[in-house]
Amino acid sequence: MPSPLVLIPTYNERGNLSSFIAAVRASLPQADILVIDDNSPDGTGILAEEIATQDAHVRVLHREQKEGLGRAYLAGFAWALERQYSHVFEIDADFSHNPKDLPRLLEATEDADLALGCRWMPGGGVSGWPWSRLGLSRFGNLYARLILGVSYRDLTGGFKCFRREGLETLGLDKIQSVGYGFQIEATWRALKSGLRVVEVPIHFTDRTVGESKMSGQTFKEALILVWRLRLGRS
């Protein structure tokens, strides 16, 4: 019977990786894990290989250089589809997404093609962010919703579960976003493809180990992207 696959893109996540993989395995023991490492200078990829030698459910995909979150996930999606996994998860490696929520997202896809972890709905929330970042995230989501004309409340979120059939019809070859704008574009293309999409409340906790990969350039990319999508230029 096909099993789920959890994609974990990494860049300098050595301090989180062992405990995070253990938490994913405990929460969803039937799932395989694919660590997608962008040649991390801190040895994350090496550690991932060590873990994989001890656990047959863990695989590692090494990429030569850091090319952005979007390209890492696209490589992971291609890997998953080639191997006929039933579901494919996106999740951050720094515990900002709680692995205990994996079963809830999986259950939500019984009646949907894509389950989105949502911070901005009743039952969801965010911990550890300053007011400035909270405001920026809320503004970014509202901006994207208004420009794209969709009702979903967390277009920028990165905790997702796709059914394989949904990924196969999404048009992955059309996705152009390299960085975090990928999250907006992937959800937008899912909706445009007619996929059934549901939101599941999650609690997001800011990382305590390692450094955030977010930047001002990330925000600018998203601002431009939504207009490109709206005008059909992406």
Which residue stretches match the model-derived regions?
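Catalytic donor-sugar/metal-binding loop of nucleotide-sugar-dependent glycosyltransferases
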Residues: 151, 174-178, 187-204
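Acidic helix N-cap motif at the loop->helix transition within catalytic regions
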Residues: 15-19, 42-51
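Acceptor/aglycone-binding surface of glycosyltransferases and processive sugar-polymer synthases
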Residues: 59, 63-82, 87, 99-180, ...
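A conserved acidic beta->alpha catalytic loop
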Residues: 37-46, 65, 95
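Cell-envelope/extracellular polymer assembly enzymes that use nucleotide-activated donors
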Residues: 3-5, 32, 185
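Short beta-strand/loop segment that forms part of the nucleotide-sugar
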Residues: 30-40, 61-62, 91
